Structures are given as structure tokens and as C-alpha cells.
From Swiss-Prot:
EC assignment: 3.6.1.27
Transmembrane regions: 1-21, 46-66, 90-110, 114-134, 192-212, 225-245, 253-273
Name recorded for this polypeptide: Undecaprenyl-diphosphatase
Keywords: Antibiotic resistance, Cell inner membrane, Cell membrane, Cell shape, Cell wall biogenesis/degradation, Hydrolase, Membrane, Peptidoglycan synthesis, Transmembrane, Transmembrane helix
Reaction(s) catalysed by this chain's protein: di-trans,octa-cis-undecaprenyl diphosphate + H2O = di-trans,octa-cis-undecaprenyl phosphate + phosphate + H(+)
GO CC aspect terms: plasma membrane
Alphabetical list of HAMAP family matching this protein: Undec_diphosphatase
GO biological process entries: cell wall organization; peptidoglycan biosynthetic process; regulation of cell shape; response to antibiotic
Length: 292
């Protein structure tokens, strides 16, 4: 892989991991179009490892929030009042919201990996329509401080749906938050915070299992470093841009993006450019790793 291609993959990972449009779908299709097969262990390792860059972007961008939530939860435990403050409660609600995706990932990982490109196209369209419904029907009034245990669990279930390629981890969780009445920005902010435990755990597991595939592959190793750095830097900027966008604008642009991407993938399948089935298992969805 050339360094230009590696940088483009890193940029694509950053854009589609945080925007509610599915990084899995875009990385898979872009890779297929450039002739990179997931049968190639080096490419699979590359796709998996560059997602560490976007995980790092979340950690850096929300470092103050994460430190505050962890400290509050620790103080609450030490004082025998784990839910004594709003910040401590939010920290534990994030842990609670992580449970559904962790269980689903463990139980369904290999079945999910057998799904093909028609599923990606269908997920892009279906979740795009759900996002449209959330945009039009939700109240958009609640703040992050209003998150309760039930909200965290329901949004956690939405996060588990991101295991389906094409659904998007950020897409399912932001949509879930909006359907529960949260503002667009609050839904996105909670979505990003909720991603931290699962992406760290899944990322560590995937890194451990895929890094050996790059041993002795100097060119691929350099390309992977470039892609990871680009995804980290661009990911930080995308988070900042998305939160600013959602403060004053709607998600309609992402609805259109999802519908157009789903239609384009379907057309590529029908024309024979893309295979219909999963000839090789897709990379795990970015958030879990997951499908964002």
C-alpha cells in the first residue's frame, strides 16, 4: 500500500468513525475498489490498527471529562456512595451502557463477520431512515446531565446494534439518544463517552491478535503508522467539528449521506463491481471495534 493510500484510509476512518455514516461500510468498499482484499492478513491488520488512532482522538478530546468522571466514581466508591454525585452516576451509567455491546460482541462476533455487502447497503438505508425519524419526531431537549440508568442501557443496546456492518456505532447511539429526547449535541457527546470503554477493550484485543501479521512487512508497517497518525489527528478535528455542527444544525445531511451510500453500494453489487456475499469476514465494527 502506498503512503498516499494509507493517508486516505486514515482520513476516511476519521470521518466515518465519528460521523453517523458507518466507517465499516466505507472502509470495506473503498478497500474493495482499490483492490485490497480482506483475505490479505496485512490489509486486515492495517484496517484494524488505524482505528486505534480514532480511539486516541476520543481520549485526548474528552480527557478532562474522562478524568472528572473517573475521579468522581472513585471518590464515590471510597466514601461508600458510588452514586452520590451527578458525575459519579454518569460514570457508572457509561459502564452500564457498555454491557450490551460487550455481551453481543462476545456472543455474535463470528456470525456478524459472515454478513455480506447487501447487509451493509441495507443497514445504511435502514438506519438512515431511523435517524430521519429521530430528527423529525424527537423533542431534542434533554442534556447529558439528564442521562439515567434506563437511558444508558437503551443507548447501550443501540451501541450493540453497531456490530452489524453498515449500521455505525456513532449512528446507532446518536440516533438512540435523540429518540430518547436528548439534544443532538448531548446525544453525540454521550455517544463519544460511551465509546471509550468498549473501543479500548476491543481495540486492545484486536491489536494483540493482528499486530503479528505485520512482522517482516516494512512497507505495510510504515503505511499503518501513517494511517494511524492521520486518523488520530483528523479524528480530533472531526469530533470538534461535529459537536459544533450539531449545536445549531440538524442531522439531515447524514441521512442523505447514508441513503446515497446504501444506494451506491447496492448499484455496485448489481453491476458486479462488488461481491454480494462476504468472501472474507469484514473488520469488526469500529466501535467494538464496531461499525460506526
Amino acid at each position: 500500500m502506498s503512503l498516499v493510500s494509507a493517508a486516505l484510509f486514515g482520513l476516511l476512518q476519521a470521518l466515518t468513525e465519528f460521523l453517523p455514516v458507518s466507517s465499516t461500510a466505507h472502509l470495506l468498499v473503498f478497500g474493495e475498489l482499490l483492490g485490497h482484499s480482506l483475505d490479505d492478513r496485512r490489509f486486515r491488520a492495517f484496517v484494524t490498527i488505524i482505528q486505534a488512532g480514532t480511539t486516541l482522538a476520543v481520549l485526548v478530546y474528552f480527557r478532562a471529562d474522562i478524568a472528572r468522571l473517573v475521579a468522581a466514581a472513585a471518590r464515590g466508591l471510597a466514601r461508600g456512595r458510588p452514586f452520590g454525585t451527578p458525575e459519579a452516576r454518569l460514570g457508572w451509567y457509561i459502564v452500564l451502557g457498555t454491557v450490551p455491546a460487550a455481551l453481543a460482541g462476545k456472543l455474535l462476533e463470528h456470525r456478524i463477520e459472515a454478513l455480506g455487502n447487501w447487509v451493509i447497503a441495507g443497514s445504511l438505508v435502514a438506519l438512515g431512515l431511523v435517524l430521519l425519524a429521530a430528527e423529525r419526531l424527537a423533542s431534542h431537549r434533554r442534556r447529558v446531565e439528564d442521562v439515567g440508568a434506563g437511558d444508558a442501557l437503551l443507548i447501550g443496546v443501540a451501541q450493540a446494534l453497531a456490530l452489524v456492518p453498515g449500521s455505525s456505532r456513532s449512528g446507532t447511539t446518536i440516533t438512540g439518544g435523540m429518540l430518547l429526547g436528548f439534544t443532538r449535541e448531548a446525544a453525540a457527546r454521550f455517544s463519544f463517552l460511551l465509546s471509550v470503554p468498549i473501543t479500548l477493550a476491543a481495540g486492545a484485543y484486536k491489536l494483540w491478535s493482528t499486530v503479528p501479521d505485520l512482522r517482516g512487512e516494512a512497507a505495510w508497517t510504515v503505511a499503518t503508522v501513517v494511517g494511524t497518525v492521520v486518523s488520530a489527528v483528523a479524528g480530533y478535528l472531526v469530533i470538534d467539528w461535529l459537536l459544533a455542527w450539531l449545536r445549531t444544525r440538524t442531522t439531515y445531511v447524514f441521512v442523505v449521506w447514508r441513503l446515497a451510500a446504501g444506494a451506491a453500494i447496492a448499484a455496485l453489487i448489481l453491476s458486479g463491481v462488488l461481491p454480494a456475499g462476504a468472501e472474507a469476514p469484514p473488520p469488526p465494527p469500529p466501535a467494538l471495534h464496531a461499525a460506526p
